[in-house]
């Protein structure tokens, strides 16, 4: 019985609890390992705070001393009479100098308007000659009477080269002249005949016209055959 009582008295005691709820240790101030590490991290910050304040206090006296030293430096004095002539020379322009400047400014402002009007009139004059040839081109071409008659149909009317019978037949144009193979096309000899208008008229004449019956009468299939 005595042995059992001594064993109970000598039973190991439980470790202390950390405020976070985990088991702590007497070596770590009854804190767990995590809380003890956080506690150690906070201690250097608390130690450095007073040191920084002391360093700032050490710096401020030096700044004040430097300020006092700057104020003690004598500043050179400047005579006000020396500055007055320069200010007067810069800021006091005479009216005689400004007069011609303003006049020239007015002249320069008024002259561009006149030039612009002149340029507009010149541009209209320049454009009008360009419109006249277009009106001539759109109008009718000169008649055959303005051109001289061909003396010999055996020669080209343009280059006066001698033509054979076959060339005379192939080179004859509707304008009434005979040309060689180099000048037989209308674009090459400034033909006065309206080939495009004649072609349109011929195309209209050759068009197939369909006879359409207009009315309401109906005819059955086969009535015409019977």
From Swiss-Prot:
Which Gene3D superfamilies does the record match to this protein?
Answer: 1.20.5.4770, AN1-like Zinc finger
Which residue ranges have biased composition labelled Basic and acidic residues?
Answer: 134-146
Enumerate the residue ranges forming zinc fingers (A20-type): 12-44
The UniProt annotation places Zn(2+) 3 binding at: 173, 175, 189, 191
Which terms does the record give in the GO molecular function aspect? DNA binding; zinc ion binding
Note the zinc finger regions (AN1-type) by start and end residue.
150-199
Residue numbers binding Zn(2+) 2? 156, 159, 180, 183
Q: Which domain of life is it from?
A: Eukaryota
Name the residues that bind Zn(2+) 1.
18, 20, 32, 35
Q: Which UniProt keywords apply?
A: Metal-binding, Zinc, Zinc-finger
- InterPro entries xref list: AN1-like_Znf, AN1_A20_ZnFinger, Znf_A20, Znf_AN1
Q: Where is there biased composition of kind Polar residues?
A: 49-59, 67-92, 105-114
Where in this protein does the record put region Disordered?
A: 42-149
What is the name of the protein in this document?
AN1-type zinc finger protein 3 homolog
């Amino acid at each position: 019985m005595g042995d059992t009582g001594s064993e109970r008295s000598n039973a190991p005691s439980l470790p202390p609890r950390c405020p976070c709820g985990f088991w702590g240790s007497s070596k770590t101030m009854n804190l767990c390992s995590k809380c003890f590490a956080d506690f150690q991290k906070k201690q250097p910050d608390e130690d450095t705070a007073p040191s920084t304040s002391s360093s700032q206090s050490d710096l401020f006296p030096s700044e004040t001393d430097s300020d006092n030293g700057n104020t003690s430096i004598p500043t050179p004095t400047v005579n006000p009479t020396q500055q007055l002539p320069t200010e007067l020379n810069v800021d006091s322009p005479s009216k005689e100098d400004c007069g011609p400047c303003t006049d020239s400014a007015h002249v320069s402002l008024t002259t561009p308007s006149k030039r612009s009007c002149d340029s507009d009139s010149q541009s209209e004059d320049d454009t009008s000659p360009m419109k006249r040839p277009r009106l001539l081109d759109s109008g009718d071409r000169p008649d055959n009477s303005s051109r001289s008659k061909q003396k010999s149909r055996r020669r080209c009317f343009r280059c006066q080269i001698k033509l054979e019978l076959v060339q005379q037949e192939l080179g004859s144009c509707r304008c009434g002249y005979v040309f060689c193979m180099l000048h037989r096309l209308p674009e090459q000899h400034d033909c006065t005949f309206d080939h495009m208008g004649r072609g349109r008229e011929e195309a209209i004449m050759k068009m197939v016209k369909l006879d359409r019956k207009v009315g309401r009468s109906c005819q059955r299939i086969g009535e015409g055959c019977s």
